[in-house]
A protein has these predicted regions:
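Conserved Nudix-box catalytic region and its N-terminal flanking loop in Nudix hydrolases
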Residues: 22-62
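NUDIX/MutT-family hydrolases
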Residues: 104-136
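Conserved small/polar residues in nucleotide/adenosyl-binding loops
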Residues: 141-142
Length: 144
């Protein structure tokens, strides 16, 4: 049985911001579970028995060579992809990189990474990234 297809899956996401206010995005690769070729806030699946923050830390370490601090829950959203027959529940967290420089360690899952100014993001974003971005921009506007 497959997570997100045969039953609802849980996938965590990380919004990471550098000291210039740029957002870290990754382009989904050919082996991604869905929305291949689109840019996203990186993340991954939660394994059975794994806490959300631990899953996010593991995914950032495995896929990008990063150690992160999970700071705050931004959003929990339904990530429903009718064309792909998938449904994920997606908690997304605002995080900070504590060590490492981002690199692509699993090229099948990710083909490109980059830091983007919030006003100059790629237009081809995943569904959940668009939703998370809207909530993040509202959060920083309120906090400013």
């Amino acid at each position: 049985m497959k997570r997100g297809v045969d039953y609802i899956g849980v996938g965590v996401g990380a919004i990471m911001v550098d000291d210039k206010g740029r957002l870290f995005l990754a382009r989904r690769g050919p082996l991604a579970k869905n929305e291949r070729g689109l840019w996203e806030f990186p993340g991954g699946s939660v394994e059975f028995g794994e806490k959300l923050a631990d899953a996010l830390k593991r995914e950032m370490r495995e896929e990008y060579g990063l150690e992160i601090e999970v700071r705050r829950l931004l959003d929990v959203a339904d990530h429903i992809l009718p064309d792909e027959g998938q449904h994920w529940v997606s908690p997304t967290f605002v995080c900070a990189i504590t060590s490492g420089d981002p690199q692509i360690l699993e090229p099948g899952k990710c083909t490109e990474i980059g830091w983007f100014d919030p006003g100059a993001l790629p237009s081809d974003l995943t569904v959940i990234t668009r939703e998370n971005l809207q909530h993040y921009l509202q959060l920083i506007h309120i906090s400013a």
